[in-house]
From Swiss-Prot:
Topology class, membrane: Multi-pass membrane protein
Pfam families registered for this protein in UniProt: SirB (PF04247)
Gene null: resulting phenotype: Not essential for the ability to invade cultured HeLa cells (the invasive phenotype).
Name of the coding gene: sirB2
Protein name in UniProt: Protein SirB2
Keyword Transmembrane helix found: yes
């Protein structure tokens, strides 16, 4: 698979993953039946797995490694992804373990972190130097 194909797959998965995250949060917030639909528990992890695999493929093909001088932006991006995942879990908490207020705060914070991840990926300039 070429770098262009991997990048295209990665970007499509990003768009689908973010769109489903926003939709699932909205459905949950509004109490819509789609929030509890079976497919909303199956499809997002499949897309996120493809996203992860395409990202690993891009790392292998481009030889840009995290935790190196040339890959410092990628290191920051990976930490951002971890923070985004944690905030996403809080925002979409289906066990009702967290308050509505915690979910309400976690959702926009996740979107801010997502913006930072996208900025790092597009500029390849680390925020922390």
């Amino acid at each position: 698979m070429t770098i262009a194909m991997l990048l295209t797959l990665h970007l499509i998965c990003v768009a689908l993953s973010v769109s489903l995250f926003v939709a699932r949060y909205w459905w949950r917030y509004c109490g819509h039946a789609l929030a509890a639909a079976r497919w909303t528990r199956i499809v997002p992890p499949v897309i996120d797995t493809l996203l992860l695999l395409s990202g690993i493929g891009l790392i292998v093909k481009t030889h840009i490694l995290p935790f190196t001088e040339s890959g410092s932006w990628l290191t920051e991006k990976l930490f951002g992804v971890i923070i985004y995942i944690v905030l996403g879990f809080i925002a979409l908490d289906y066990r009702q373990a967290r308050s509505q207020q915690a979910r309400f705060i976690a959702f926009p914070l996740a979107l801010v972190v997502l913006y930072i991840i996208i900025k790092l990926a597009t500029t390849k300039i680390p925020l922390l130097g």
